[in-house]
């Protein structure tokens, strides 16, 4: 793994996808139904349609990137429970947190307890939301599973998981490396 490339290119790209998904999910949760939408590029109308043409793919991409980041940090799901990956069970070509080195040595895998502690008011809820989001990315998006579609994840759980994932990266990657997270490249304005 090329650590500098991962930290300077791929990690910010994944975090941008999460930030955009969080923003879109917050908007979508405010709307009772899809709204009409126009997208302008360089002050010219380029796309017209319903909000779902943008929000749905943005959310799906965010869930997939969250799954990848959680796996990068050493978290996975076994029998519906968030658990820590066994370090030597990971493939040699996987991008993993323990391949990054800070001033005090290699970074450590994140434990489920550390992941839950990001949300001190409900650590178990945070762990459950993360587990559900990993499963959603795997069984609902990367693969098609009939059992998943009978019980999809609630929007509130996905929102919590996306936000917790961002905070985990900040706390367990950027902070130990003495780096700042790059700024989010999108702004939104409230509707009038």
List each language-model region with its residue ranges:
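Charged alpha-helical initiation segments
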Residues: 1-53, 154-192
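Long, hydrophobic, amphipathic alpha-helical segments used as structural scaffolds
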Residues: 73-80, 141-152, 173-180
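Short acidic alpha-helical/loop segments enriched in Asp/Glu that coordinate divalent cations
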Residues: 29-42, 46, 75-102
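Short, hydrophobic, well-ordered secondary-structure elements
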Residues: 55-80
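Charged, amphipathic alpha-helical oligomerization/scaffolding segments
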Residues: 61, 68, 129-136, 160-171
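Histidine-centered, metal-coordinating catalytic motifs and their short helical/loop contexts
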Residues: 101-151
């Amino acid at each position: 793994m090329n650590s500098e490339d991962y930290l300077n290119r791929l990690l910010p790209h994944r975090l941008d996808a999460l930030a955009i998904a969080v923003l879109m999910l917050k908007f979508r949760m405010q709307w009772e139904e899809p709204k009409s939408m126009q997208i302008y590029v360089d002050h010219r109308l380029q796309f017209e349609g319903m909000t779902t043409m943008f929000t749905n793919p943005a959310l799906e991409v965010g869930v997939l990137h969250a799954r990848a980041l959680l796996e990068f940090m050493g978290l996975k799901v076994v029998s519906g429970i968030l658990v820590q990956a066994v370090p030597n069970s990971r493939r040699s070509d996987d991008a993993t947190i323990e391949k990054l080195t800070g001033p005090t040595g290699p970074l450590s895998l994140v434990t489920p307890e550390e992941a839950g502690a990001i949300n001190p008011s409900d650590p178990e809820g945070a762990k459950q939301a993360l587990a559900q989001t990993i499963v959603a990315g795997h069984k609902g998006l990367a693969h098609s599973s009939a059992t998943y579609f009978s019980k999809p994840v609630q929007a509130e759980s996905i929102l919590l998981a996306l936000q917790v994932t961002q905070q985990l990266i900040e706390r367990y990657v950027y902070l130990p490396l003495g780096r700042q997270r790059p700024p989010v490249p999108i702004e939104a304005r409230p509707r009038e």
